[in-house]
Amino acid sequence: MRAIEEGADFIETDILSSKDGVLVCFHDVILDDTTNVANYKEFADRKRTYEVQGVNTTGYFIVDFTLKELKSLRVNQRFSFRDQQFNGKFQIITFEEFITIALDAPRVVGIYPEIKNPVLINQYVKWSGGKKFEDKFVETLHKFGYKGSYLSKNWLKQPVFIQSFAPTSLLYISNQTDLPKVFLIDDVDIPTQDTNQSYWEITSDTYLDYIKQYVLGIGPWKDTLVPVINNYAMTPSDLVSRAHARNLQVHPYTYRNENKYLHFNYSQDPYKEYDYWINNIGVDGLFTDFTGSLHNFQEWTAPNHHDNTASKLLHEIALLASPYE
């Protein structure tokens, strides 16, 4: 909700599933790092070792807990250098609760949910009728009225981008919805989780020509677009220009304000980083942990800083929106 207050156009979340098939918002497949699960004696025997993207991983896996059990936990801030005052105060929320936050906002706020780790989820969570994780994901969006291709009237009422690192998931749901999809691309040494394809294969001209039939854009890790050596951003790759040549949007991730994430080229100034990526690299959108700073940058650098045309347009779009039934 704070992101909405700070001006976010879209709010982003990763979607996983509980043991009993309820879709929830959570970043990791294990609960260890960002919840207090280790404090619960009744869950002490739940620790497991599963293969996750080719790596044996041990922890308290979200797929081994029912929604009721997940709701009994409280979440914590992952990074020790960030504000810790909210640790232990909030529950894990469901996908439906997340959607409601966006729909209840006083203006149009889009959502940007990720189909997260579908290989693992489909392996350990089973739904009636042979349905898959991806089916339940799309059903949830349809239930709340999300429909329509990019920039269509229906899409503008309730904007959404569907993202995933798993290309087979995006291809699978392309037969169920025309909502815009974004293919996420990991670091150069991490293959795709479902097809085991290398970074170089999925960023080749041949693959971009293939995937553009199913997605609106790509979402690469930003340090693969502009390689980094000794904390200096180097010469950009040509991936953005090759994507744009195929009418693919580019939405890199993740931009953060802390000094440890800002390369020396930007003099520890996040506004310089935004300026470089938006005006030099020419990205079409980006993921940030600091909505307020990006929103301020957009406001301060708008061609007509005092022109409220954009605000009026957003208000008109908001008037088109109706609550889901």
Residue positions per predicted region:
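Phosphate-group recognition and catalysis centered on beta-loop-alpha active-site segments
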Residues: M1-E325
